[in-house]
Amino acid sequence: NGKLVPASRIQVTIDNFYARNEPMILRVLDATTRFFVKLRARPVLWVLSRLMGTVLPTGEVVTTERAIDFIDTISVLDKTEIAVGPCMCQKALQKRSGTYIKDVVIIYGAEAYKMAYPEYKDLSPDEAKALLRKFQEEGLMPTFYSCLRSGGWIYAICNCEGKICFPFRAHQAAGAVMYPGPDVVSLNSDECIGCGTCIDRCHFSANTLFNGTCKVEQTKCYGCGVCIPTCKGQ
């Protein structure tokens, strides 16, 4: 509901545990998911994704503007904790794809990750907002991550892409790991020049080209908005 409330002891305990063990958890889940994808065992993947979505953090895809608004909201705190560190998926799987330092952690999430990993560095609210705008230019989708399907225990703004991001790949395989945000893209077909840039930038294959004009399948759109700033038809 947009209100700031004190973090409970259980929230902090869960986040501290997950922060310390996230690389190991990601490696195990990545190997397990790959194994069952190879077997084409969709019923098992369905159960696995629901379990992951229940006991592990889940993501809500949002626009960069909403992520920046959230930074402004938490900036009213007496001590605003914001930090940035390595992409945990890249760190855990020892792979690199694009920007490495892009995991923005906030409030008690910032405290937990700074304690667990020396790579995490403090950010001012203005620095965090500038980074989010930079990530948008790179085509990364901002995603609010919260614990235990709470939707309110937000501890991180991940900036995800599809090649290595484990939650994204797990969601593509079985669902129930990432959720669409409150926005969807609206297209004015009269202004579209058919360049196809939005198709290349869309992570969810919501944009397609038909008779030289882009079409948006809004049921597939998760509302990240990364296709908007590069639209040549404006």
Where are these regions (language model features)?
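Ferredoxin-like iron-sulfur electron-transfer modules
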Residues: Y145-G152, Q172-R201, S205-G223
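Local cysteine-cluster metal-coordination motifs and their immediate loop/turn environment
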Residues: G85-L93, Y155-F168, D190-F204, K220-G233
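Beta-sheet entry/capping signal
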Residues: K3, E81-I82, T213
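Catalytic cores of enzyme domains
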Residues: L29-G181
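Short, amphipathic alpha-helical interaction segments positioned at domain boundaries
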Residues: G2-K38
